[in-house]
Amino acid sequence: MSHTVKIYDTCIGCTQCVRACPTDVLEMVPWDGCKAAQVASSPRTEDCVGCKRCETACPTDFLSIRVYLGAETTRSMGLAY
């Protein structure tokens, strides 16, 4: 089943989500819009197992990273018709 990993602009570049991911779905990439000059990216979403450890590791008040599991993807992201 396919999962969607969404990274929001509230990412503070702390790398906690990257370190928490057991399947190396995430990586940090340079970004000038972040205090840390880097932001999380999810180039390998096909490897996501949906464990949501990245969400749990995120220290921001509003989770900067969210994993939407299969069928909940369009509904949770507000894309359902």
UniProtKB/Swiss-Prot annotation:
Gene Ontology annotations of biological process type: photosynthetic electron transport in photosystem I
GO cellular component, one term: plasma membrane-derived thylakoid membrane
Keyword Zinc-finger listed: no
InterPro entries hit by this protein: 4Fe4S_Fe-S-bd (IPR017896), 4Fe4S_Fe_S_CS (IPR017900), PSI_iron-sulfur_center (IPR050157), PSI_PsaC (IPR017491)
Recorded topology in the membrane: Peripheral membrane protein
Residues reported to bind [4Fe-4S] cluster 1: 11, 14, 17, 58
Enzyme class of the recorded protein, top EC level: oxidoreductase
Cofactor(s) listed in the protein's UniProt record: [4Fe-4S] cluster
Catalytic activity: reduced [plastocyanin] + hnu + oxidized [2Fe-2S]-[ferredoxin] = oxidized [plastocyanin] + reduced [2Fe-2S]-[ferredoxin]
Every 4Fe-4S ferredoxin-type domain range: 2-31, 39-68
Keyword entries, A-Z: 4Fe-4S, Electron transport, Iron, Iron-sulfur, Membrane, Metal-binding, Oxidoreductase, Photosynthesis, Photosystem I, Repeat, Thylakoid, Transport
TM region positions: none
The keyword Iron-sulfur is annotated on this UniProt entry: yes
Role noted for this protein: Apoprotein for the two 4Fe-4S centers FA and FB of photosystem I (PSI); essential for photochemical activity. FB is the terminal electron acceptor of PSI, donating electrons to ferredoxin. The C-terminus interacts with PsaA/B/D and helps assemble the protein into the PSI complex. Required for binding of PsaD and PsaE to PSI. PSI is a plastocyanin/cytochrome c6-ferredoxin oxidoreductase, converting photonic excitation into a charge separation, which transfers an electron from the donor P700 chlorophyll pair to the spectroscopically characterized acceptors A0, A1, FX, FA and FB in turn.
Subunit structure: The cyanobacterial PSI reaction center is composed of one copy each of PsaA,B,C,D,E,F,I,J,K,L,M and X, and forms dimeric and tetrameric complexes.
Protein name listed in UniProt: Photosystem I iron-sulfur center
UniProt organism field: Nostoc sp. (strain PCC 7120 / SAG 25.82 / UTEX 2576)
Gene (UniProt): psaC
